[in-house]
């Protein structure tokens, strides 16, 4: 029948098969709608099942011809064909995305990243704590502690200046000197206050107890005379050094009138007076008197019979 004409399409006229030069849009559309939508089936050599009654060889030849014609279409010179081909290739994808969706997704991801970065930079960054150098602490507790130590050092320096010959650098030794000096001042204040209140006898006993408790009695006249000269010299040069020396010897300064009252109250039956001083002597007391220009005298009361004169 028509098998020969189908096998040789170039010799027989066919309304559907034309040369590439006379290819029109109707044939192209007919080929598109009659073929499968998958691109892989277009490139496959096996012909798809159709309801056409034409032989397989004829269809295969027709399909090869159509593929050749499709590849020979100049897409750059025919804009309607370009649009149609683009629509075919895009529509044939089963999971295609609309045009511009990739760009929109990329733009959205960039916007999200920029927003995240901007939020991170907007947060205030905590500066690392710089460790202060030694002596320059910035912590309030450390500053208060440093100020407290400075005040203690200043008070210790002022207290050291009040103590005669308080040149100790060790705090413990300096505090020992301060304690001894304060005890000496307490003894002197007690003696002077008792003389003012008229308790000469009690003052004499208090002096004997306090001064003789920690020091040995001076029994030799030579040692007493040396003490007198040393105290007189110190009182002329440095009163503070003299007070410290007296403290070490268990002596204290008191007015001559107080010494006279103490001696009279201790032994009222016998009241011999020391020449040029008017201080009575008692056989039970060892009295050392050193007069100075201020009208005061140095008196020590101890249980010893020796008496010395300036």
Curated annotation (Swiss-Prot):
Q: Where is the composition biased (Low complexity)?
A: 1-20, 104-126
Q: Name one Pfam family in it.
A: HLH
Residues of the region (Basic motif) are: 136-149
Q: Where is the bHLH domain?
A: 136-185
Task: Region Disordered: list its residue ranges.
Answer: 1-23, 95-143, 203-225
Alphabetically ordered keywords of this record: DNA-binding, Nucleus, Transcription, Transcription regulation
Which Gene Ontology cellular component terms are annotated?
nucleus
Up-regulation conditions: Repressed by heat treatment.
Q: Which cysteines are joined by disulfide bonds?
A: none
| Tissue expression remark | Expressed constitutively in roots, leaves, stems, and flowers.
Q: Is-annotated flag, keyword Metal-binding?
A: no
Annotated GO molecular function terms are:
DNA binding; DNA-binding transcription factor activity; protein dimerization activity
- Consequence of gene disruption: No visible phenotype under normal growth conditions. The triple mutant lrl1, lrl2 and lrl3 exhibit very short root hairs. The double mutant drop1 and drop2 fail to develop sperm cells.
The GO annotation for biological process reads: microgametogenesis; pollen sperm cell differentiation; regulation of DNA-templated transcription; root hair cell development; root hair cell differentiation; root hair elongation
Compartments, as annotated in UniProt: Nucleus
* Region called Helix-loop-helix motif, residue ranges: 150-185
As for what it does, the entry says: Transcription factor that regulates the development of root hairs. Transcription factor that regulates the development of sperm cells.
Q: What subunit structure does UniProt give?
A: Homodimer.
Question: Which PANTHER family did the record assign?
Answer: TRANSCRIPTION FACTOR BHLH83-RELATED (PTHR16223), TRANSCRIPTION FACTOR LRL2 (PTHR16223:SF348)
What is the name attached to this protein's record? Transcription factor LRL2
The gene behind this protein is: LRL2
């Amino acid at each position: 029948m028509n098998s020969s004409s189908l096998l040789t399409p170039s010799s027989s006229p066919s309304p559907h098969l034309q040369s590439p030069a006379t290819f029109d849009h109707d044939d192209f559309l007919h080929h598109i709608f009659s073929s499968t939508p998958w691109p892989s089936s277009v490139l496959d050599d096996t012909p798809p099942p159709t309801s056409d009654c034409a032989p397989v060889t004829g269809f295969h030849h027709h399909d090869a011809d159509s593929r050749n014609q499709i590849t020979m279409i100049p897409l750059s010179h025919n804009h309607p064909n370009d649009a149609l081909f683009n629509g075919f290739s895009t529509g044939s994808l089963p999971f295609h995305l609309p045009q511009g969706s990739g760009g929109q997704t990329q733009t959205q991801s960039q916007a999200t990243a920029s927003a995240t970065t901007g939020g991170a930079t907007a947060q205030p960054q905590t500066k690392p704590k710089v460790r202060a150098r030694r002596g320059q602490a910035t912590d309030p507790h450390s500053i208060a502690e440093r100020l407290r130590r400075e005040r203690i050092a200043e008070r210790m320096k002022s207290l050291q200046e009040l103590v005669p010959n308080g040149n100790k650098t060790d705090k413990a030794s300096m505090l020992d000197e301060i304690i001894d000096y304060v005890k000496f001042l307490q003894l002197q204040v007690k003696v002077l206050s008792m003389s003012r209140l008229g308790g000469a006898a009690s003052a004499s006993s208090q002096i004997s107890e306090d001064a003789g408790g920690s020091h040995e009695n001076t029994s030799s006249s030579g040692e007493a005379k040396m003490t007198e000269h040393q105290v007189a010299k110190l009182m002329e040069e440095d009163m503070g050094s003299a007070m410290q020396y007296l403290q070490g010897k268990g002596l204290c300064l008191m007015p001559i009138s107080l010494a006279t009252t103490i001696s009279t109250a201790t032994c009222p039956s016998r009241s011999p007076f020391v020449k040029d001083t008017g201080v009575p002597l008692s056989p039970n007391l060892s009295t050392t008197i050193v007069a100075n220009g201020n009208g005061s005298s140095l008196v020590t009361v101890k249980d010893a019979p020796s008496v010395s004169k300036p």
